[in-house]
C-alpha cells in the first residue's frame, strides 16, 4: 500500500467514504463535468490498499470490467495519470498525483462530515 499521511488515514477509517449510516454526508465532486464520488473513491482507495484492481473489485462485489470502467472515469477528469501498472504489468498502484487526489478527497470528506454534525443534530431535533 502506498503511503498516505497516517493522521488522514486514521481519520478516514471513521467515517468511510461510502456512508452506510442513514445520517451523514456523501460527497460528489464534479471536475470538468466528470463526477467523482464516494463509491469511485472507495474503489480507488481499495486499489491503493490491495495494489490490485481485481482485489479491489472483489472487495466491493463488482466485476473487474466495471471497476476498470469506474477508475477510467476518474482518470478522464485529469491530464495527469492517477494509476500505474506494476512491473511486468502485474498489480496497480496509485501515482503520486493519485495519492494526492485520494488524500485531498479523504480530507474533504472528513471536514464535511465533521461540519455536518451540528446541522444533522439540529435537523433531527426538528423532525
What are these regions (language model features)?
Residues 70:
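Residues within the DNA-recognition helix of helix-turn-helix
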Residues 47-55:
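Short helix-boundary/capping micro-motifs
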Residues 101-127:
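Helix-turn-helix/homeodomain-like alpha-helical modules used for DNA recognition
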Residues 85-107:
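Basic, amphipathic "hinge/linker" alpha-helix immediately C-terminal to the N-terminal HTH DNA-binding motif
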Residues 61-63:
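Central "turn" residue of the DNA-binding helix-turn-helix
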Residues 58:
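Alpha-helical residues within the helix-turn-helix
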Residues 75-79:
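C-terminal flanking helix
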Residues 18-32:
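Short, Lys/Arg-enriched N-terminal segment that forms or immediately precedes the first helix
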